[in-house]
Amino acid sequence: MSIGIDIAAIGMVTAVGLDAPSACAAMRARLDGFQETRFLGPGGQWLIGAPVPLPRDWIGEKRMAHLAGAAICEAFESAPEARGQTALILCLAEENRPGRPVADGARLLRHIAEIVDVEPHARSRIINHDRASGHVALEQARRMISSGEAPYVMIAGVDSYLTPLAI
């Protein structure tokens, strides 16, 4: 019999909301955040995408770190007891995908830890299984909690298709 896991807190940063309550309300209202991007398509027309409106114009890994970091900070606000004792499972795009915005997952993990202002947990890890990453992460989180490897596990996913190589 496998042990159950509880969701203690959530955080979200999306094209329609920079926190979970805003993003969920926008999605319930069927907002999607799609608009013209700064990328030109083959016909010379602006491509449509759903960029996240961050306060600064960060790009690449720095942008990914701030997207994930903001969602993680939001989750820690709801569960402050987890701060400093949470293993992070970071879900990223598969390593061979053209335009993947993250070149070095371990470096991204460290950058996120700096933004969140916590030491990286020894059991933190990266999963690169594309759309299946969330399912893989849930199973790994369940195992980590049931074995006592970590009292808390946070699963975060960050990605973008709005990169020159992806387009």
Predicted regions and their residues:
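Active-site histidine-anchored catalytic micro-motif
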Residues: H135-L138, Y152-V153
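Acyl-CoA/ACP chain-elongation machinery
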Residues: P151-V153, G157-I167
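Conserved "HGTGT" condensation-loop signature of ketosynthase/thiolase-family condensing enzymes
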Residues: M1-A132, V136, R143-S147, V158, ...
